[in-house]
């Protein structure tokens, strides 16, 4: 009888959480990241993706793609973690053992589905998605197959907000025509090597002989990919060991011989390690930089923060402060950035501008959202730095008369707040003096308004 592994992937998770808790953003292109335009996109709504914007893209590029209707909001990881915890509690309740892959995706293998028909699995998956939607308000895509590899591919095919199943008997029909890059373990280097051999699809790889695999990809990795392509995947669904550290390093084909080249490499590694940190869902207290010189000497330096952070600017600034340069140590061949001291508890930075590499002057901003009857939206968000009194772009705020809201505009001594949560529908806008004593900073989690 067939086993059924289910992969659940929350759709555009960070952006969906923002649209859930800030109803005015629903249906609009939303980018999650630094409102100033520096750094990279942490999340993009499907409305933004239709313009070509995506996660890990430079923010300035994504903003140019989505145009004037786009809205950029600062990330609120406390909200994402709370939503993630609720989703995974549902998966455990309905599916049993959960293998968490990241903050927004995981596997289950419900015992009740062993030997079930595709129709029965579809009914179960529909029920799971309905429970997730009912208890969190968030969309989820579900994929199912005879192993984790196929289930993961199927959830990608199900997006957005759908279900896609592939029974073992359908493997050749549904999987073989897909690009070989869909397989786990086939990165750019392996894909290029396979293309040189004329291997473009999963089916092309599956039809290769064992000897061809051994010669072209090796007996270990090659045979593993070959078996996955053929649909053989008996890996069990089991809880993963909690990572103690996250690290990214790159070896460069040409030695780095300038300070600028080293800084660029550190920024690249910082962004990639930060992306993995977001997937993990925790914050890091220690930032490390690893350098390997042209003569193979290795030097590692680290710094420990007084708090766990998941702020990209903080990670990058700390890594740059740890840098050593070619005029000090000679040509550099490898650059890596590591994050450790991972903790669930995370502290928001009171003065994030102190951690930035490049100081910027305070400027006015206005987040480009408006009441539903407005036909044109304009975004001129240029700086998320706090004002002298401490307000920041898209910050959560509380007012005793109007409740929970978020900063939509700030400048010339005035602050504009839109008051809304998950349950209110699009909220009304109110403008106050920035020093209004009735305004106070709010816990972002309260925007979820879960009882």
Curated annotation (Swiss-Prot):
It is an enzyme of class 2 (transferase). Binds 2 magnesium ions per subunit. Keywords: Cytoplasm, DNA damage, DNA repair, DNA replication, DNA-binding, DNA-directed DNA polymerase, Magnesium, Metal-binding, Mutator protein, Nucleotidyltransferase, Transferase. The active site is at residue 105. Transmembrane segments: none annotated. Its cofactor is Mg(2+). Residues 5-187 form the UmuC domain. The keyword Nucleotidyltransferase applies. Its EC number is 2.7.7.7. GO terms for biological process: DNA-templated DNA replication; error-prone translesion synthesis; SOS response. The keyword DNA repair applies. It holds the Pfam family IMS_HHH_1. Disulfide bonds: none annotated. GO terms for molecular function: damaged DNA binding; DNA-directed DNA polymerase activity; magnesium ion binding. One of its GO terms (cellular component) is cytosol. Monomer. Poorly processive, error-prone DNA polymerase involved in untargeted mutagenesis. Copies undamaged DNA at stalled replication forks, which arise in vivo from mismatched or misaligned primer ends. These misaligned primers can be extended by PolIV. Exhibits no 3'-5' exonuclease (proofreading) activity. May be involved in translesional synthesis, in conjunction with the beta clamp from PolIII. This is DNA polymerase IV. It comes from Corynebacterium diphtheriae (strain ATCC 700971 / NCTC 13129 / Biotype gravis). The lineage of its organism: Bacteria, Bacillati, Actinomycetota, Actinomycetes, Mycobacteriales. The gene is dinB.
